[in-house]
Amino acid sequence: MNKKTLMVCGLIGLSLSLQAQTKNGGIDKQMMQKIVAGHSSASNRALSNAIATNSIDNLARNFRKAGGLDTHFSVETTKQNIHDQKSSGRCWLFSGMNVLRSNFARMHKDTLHVEFSHVYLSFHDQLEKSNLMLQGVIDNAKKPMNDPIVQFFFKNPITDGGTFCGVADLVDKYGLVPMEAMPESYSAENTSRMASIISSKLREYGLELRKMVANKKSAAAIKARKTEMLGDIYNILVLSLGEPVKTFQYAFKDKNGNNVGKPQTYTPETFRDAVLGKKLNGSFIMAMNDPRREYYKTYEVEYDRHTYDGHNWKYINLPMEDIAKMAIASLKDDTKMYSSYDVGKQLDLKRGYLDLDNFDYATLFGTKFPMNKAERISTF
């Protein structure tokens, strides 16, 4: 049997397979009749007209939640300026900086305030994540392209999201600088295009590194080429975010914004030591509520970190009741508690308010959404 015969046989087999799939699993006419039955009522037509010309959220908004919000809190922490992450995924970094500057104000009995540069750590975060991706590709280069770990690196080479573990690793490694020393840039506040460009380069570089491993290039040659690649990424970051400062002059300020003492010369490392007085790693724990897994045990997510030589996302799994007690105790101690949520669900953007009953999508569409938290996490 020649190649042409094999190809014809293959096409016939594929055709028969597709016919079988359509017959058994496709939407046939009889099924379509059942699907569309009962959807032409007057009430459905009215809803269709409304939904076609209005925002789904506006129509599903729960009017019972439209009253004024009670902004009184029985326990409050030291007040600070509010910072806006704009169109970026750096909520983890902004929250982490909020905790650090709150701790600084508390250490000085609210007599001194400081504002940290977000873009300084964002720069190093993106460079470190680029190295994490490239080194991860090297480490797994002998695995096929369809291996889950290899796909993990190539599918999302870099993001600007993260956890407090990333804050700790970056601050401990690169220090801190005040906002005045390195202000936000356009690409820091609008990260999507820069991330897309860097991701494209990382995919290109990842394939090249896999070829180098396949061609049995030496470890030294591979490391040298990776270093050149990171130099290109560094250049993109410098042009987009600005070059990280090495030294700067700074005078601390009181809560009214007035300088306290004369400006002094700092490096990012000496400034970090001045405001924190200690390394962050080893000074905190991460708690998580994941009802899929056994409580009161510690879990670690491999490669879910910001730096190759840093710490994975590691957490103790606790019931929400325990986490709530920890949060209250932290607030009573005037210590802000870093926390993260899936704010894409039931968030009223206009009011800045999260509530499970903000929007009633089930009633609007005549259906139910019965999945519990464990099921939602398992299937996202």
Regions found by a protein language model. Name each.
Residues 1-23:
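Bacterial Sec-dependent N-terminal signal peptides
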Residues 6-9, 21, 273, 278, ...:
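Compositionally biased, low-complexity repeat tracts
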Residues 14-16, 20, 106, 141-142, ...:
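Alpha-helix boundary/interfacial micro-motifs
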Residues 22-81:
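N-terminal regions that are enriched for targeting/export leaders
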Residues 28, 55, 117, 266-267, ...:
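Helix N-terminus capping/helix-initiation residues
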Residues 49-51, 57-59, 65-67, 94-98, ...:
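Short linear motifs at secondary-structure transitions and domain/linker junctions
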Residues 68-280, 284-299, 305-338:
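Active-site nucleophile-adjacent alpha helix/oxyanion-hole segment immediately C-terminal to the catalytic cysteine
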Residues 87, 153-154, 200-202, 321-380:
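Active-site-adjacent substructure of cysteine-protease-like catalytic cores
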